[in-house]
Amino acid sequence: MTTTQNKIKNNDITIRQTQIDDATKLPAIEQSAGQLFSTLEDLRWISESGVQSVEKHLAFIDQQGHWVAVNSDNEPVGFIMTTALPESLFIHELSVSQDWQNRGIGKLLIQKVKDKAKVHKFDSVTLTTFRHVPWNAPYYQRLGFSILPESEIPHSLQEILDDEVERGGFVKETRCAMKFEV
């Protein structure tokens, strides 16, 4: 793997800042990635639900909190969306197209966020996810994230978890907040 200031490369995959022209291709990637949930009885509804709008992607792109993994044809195959919280850089969404999963692309995207967090002097990278889904909390734990005990969840992160339950339809006990110390 080679690293430059703005890009991470691994074989035929490059991680770069998302461009405006990429935005229309990203909902299809999220839809494809979400199909994995169709294999889980209790979460099948996620594979049938909506995805981030092009407008939402554009807002994250405008805030420079959005990176894509592109193939050798410069076509997006995965993305990661982040936003700054008072205490951390928060991963809002990570999606890799089904055809490109299990190739280390998610790991590369997360590494880009970890690098950006360090450069911008964040103490940590955080996210919210499912505790029991193999490609969620257990995956992030393999990448160095730890599940935060409820008593240690910062207010801004707790608000996100609460919103996921209230508006997102998630069951509170299935969700967790995770943190990677930069």
Q: Language-model segments: what does each one mean?
A:
Residues 14-28:
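A short beta-loop-alpha structural element at the N-terminal edge
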Residues 52-68, 90, 171-173:
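A short helix-loop-beta-strand connector motif used in the catalytic cores of GNAT acetyltransferases and
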